[in-house]
Amino acid sequence: MAERIAGMKKARRCILTGSLCLVAVAIASGAQGRENPAEVISWNRCLGQRPGFYATSEAVRIADNVLLYQRNTGGWSKNVDMARVLSEQDKAKLRKAKSKKDSTLDNSATHTQIRYLAKVYYATRLERFRQALLRGIDYLLEAQYANGGWPQTYPGLRGYSKFITFNDGAMIGAMSVLRDIAEKKPTYAFADEVRRQKANNAVQKGIECILKCQIVVNGKKTAWCAQHDEKTFIPRKARSYELPSISGSESVGVVRFLMSIDNPSPEAIEAIQSAVAWFGRVKLTGIRQINKPDSSLESGYDKVIIKDATAPPVWARFYQIGTNKPIFCSRDGIPKATLAEISYERRTGYSWLGYYATSLLAKDYPAWQKKWAPEKDLLSK
């Protein structure tokens, strides 16, 4: 009997201890306004939450952060974790920084913030978020060139940031948001009719710009550079190691956007077919990129390319215009034919090869081709 009573007391202690632990975790997880509360999510995970999240106090807290980070231009700067908990001092600094001219589309900035605020507004109907959204939309519309392209940064048009930019999905990200607005997708129904019409016009002009930028070699259309001249549409150089070239990476996002057009024009169909054919011609087979351990090196490894007959196809980040040969480059701006020839710092600090077009060719194109170009399958054997 005594053993039974002791066992019951032990069980109650375990239940009580467990309950207290759960309460402690809940308090830590839900804490807001303290200097160092437990983080729930980071900014790069904010768009991937379940629908119910966007009505929570945590989602609203992050959305209020996004409002603080919004510049007077209506856009946002890049490389900032906008989900972190802000102190009052942080907030004061952000209010003083409102007039900065560093709004950009680089690294998914601005269009990502618009998408997040749209989700929170749709769930909460808090007017301050709608007003911020309208300013963000106006920023995208104002930043567009008359020829339909978008610069990387606006209004700070200088250096390569003034070029029409496909790098890191800049222009495609802006166009995707504006198309959702133009089509009055549920999350974007907050926009008025005037802005919807402007968004639609901007998207159509953007498509025309994309088609004009497609690189033609010996009369044959290929794909796109990561950035193009804002006046002549020719491929342009960005950073010292990002030379004028045909991009095996950025072109994938461009083609996917064109494929998403409902009832595409003959010109859009031709652009897609030409780009897909180019991807098929320039794929690299029989090689694999690996990280080779080497304790003598700064990062403890080196990136090397080995022969491997079983390796799936890969694509180079950059191809030389005219030869379709992969190019690699150090900060000296001198193109090299192999990864091994460039500096260790650039070799390990940048993406030069990848499975960029794998799913585009294996999944996206077959589905698109059956619907919009059933008589011409460029990938059929």
Language-model segment annotations:
Residues 1-12:
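N-terminal secretory signal peptides that target proteins for export/translocation
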Residues 17-26:
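Bacterial N-terminal signal peptides
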Residues 25-35:
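Bacterial Sec-dependent signal peptides at the C-terminal "C-region" and cleavage site
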Residues 33-62, 180-205, 231-238, 242, ...:
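Terminal, non-catalytic domain-edge segments
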Residues 56, 60-111, 116:
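N-terminal carbohydrate-binding/catalytic regions of secreted carbohydrate-active enzymes
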Residues 62-74, 132-149, 200-219, 271-288:
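Long, well-ordered core segments of solenoidal/helical folds
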Residues 82-105, 149-166, 231-243:
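A cross-kingdom feature marking solvent-exposed beta-strand/loop segments within repeated
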Residues 130, 134-137, 141, 158-214, ...:
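Eukaryote-skewed repeat-based solenoidal scaffolds used as protein-protein interaction platforms
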